[in-house]
Amino acid sequence: MRHLLGIEGWRRDELESLLDRAKAHLPGGPDTTHLLRGKVVANLFFEDSTRTRTSFHMAAKGLGASVLNWTHTGSSVSKGETLLDTARNIEATGPVAIVMRHRSSGAPHLVAKHVKCAVINAGDGTHEHPSQALLDAFTLRQRWGSLDGRTVLIVGDVLHSRVARSNLHCLKALGAQVVMCGPPTLLPPGLESLGAEVTHNLDAALPRADAVMCLRVQLERQEQAFLPSTREYARLFGLNAAREERMKAGAVVMHPGPINRGVELAPAVADGARSVILEQVSNGVAVRRAILEVCTA
């Protein structure tokens, strides 16, 4: 049994082994419905989620597990139940894994210290979203074979993005160079010390990127003065058709979703030939099956 609380702490060989295992879970692969037959996986989501919760649900069912879907709406949390009490009550139903999303950074780490089953972080505050980073890396490996020597440009609200943090750790561990790009107000200090290159000039960074990952701009950031306007953001950092033409041959466009069309990505780019966004979604089920398999072994 092993927790997946973040990418930090996982060695390159461990990440590659998990990603290699995910290939067996792609459509057309061997039958895996026996791996967790008779077991229960609990989805414990304190934040709304469509893609991640559905993907983990499908992953668990594909391994033969029963799935307990818990959401905060109408739960005892609204009556004052603590996080640990909720987690312990869920654990008492006998799951082999708790897949957990929470608004507070570090919440899955706290739960992992107090339960005996595997805890899988499905996103905690602005800290990490490890399964998203793994499916992103898997998507690129399927295209390239290896990430060694590749350059991945991550554009947008890095400051508040758990996806960016997990991807930085994962991509660097797998041999890629990571460039972070965005307005100064949305790039946290210390990125260079984690191995990232930092730029505020998207047009200068685009031509050398093998993949461009656009992050969702949370529209409330404009009200909090992180952005002058979404129109200004799109002008400086949005990936439109003109900018797409400056990308190198074979470079791909990624987005963790949901997309603000016309802000981070022009519709023609999001739906264009370079886009692997739907591949990311479909690969997510295979990667999350591998995560459940590895963490519950």
From Swiss-Prot:
One of its GO terms (cellular component) is cytosol. It comes from Myxococcus xanthus (strain DK1622). Keywords: Pyrimidine biosynthesis, Transferase. Belongs to the aspartate/ornithine carbamoyltransferase superfamily. ATCase family. HAMAP family: Asp_carb_tr. Heterododecamer (2C3:3R2) of six catalytic PyrB chains organized as two trimers (C3), and six regulatory PyrI chains organized as three dimers (R2). InterPro entries: Asp/Orn_carbamoyltranf_P-bd, Asp/Orn_carbamoylTrfase, Asp/Orn_carbamoylTrfase_sf, Asp_carbamoyltransf, Asp_carbamoyltransf_Asp/Orn-bd. Coiled coil: none annotated. This is Aspartate carbamoyltransferase catalytic subunit. Catalyzes the condensation of carbamoyl phosphate and aspartate to form carbamoyl aspartate and inorganic phosphate, the committed step in the de novo pyrimidine nucleotide biosynthesis pathway. Pathway: Pyrimidine metabolism; UMP biosynthesis via de novo pathway; (S)-dihydroorotate from bicarbonate: step 2/3. It catalyses: carbamoyl phosphate + L-aspartate = N-carbamoyl-L-aspartate + phosphate + H(+). Its EC number is 2.1.3.2. L-aspartate binds at K79, R162, R216. NCBIfam families: asp_carb_tr, PRK00856.1. The keyword Ribosomal protein does not apply. The keyword Ligase does not apply. Carbamoyl phosphate binds at R51, T52, R101, H129, Q132, G257, P258. GO terms for biological process: 'de novo' pyrimidine nucleobase biosynthetic process; 'de novo' UMP biosynthetic process; amino acid metabolic process. GO terms for molecular function: amino acid binding; aspartate carbamoyltransferase activity.
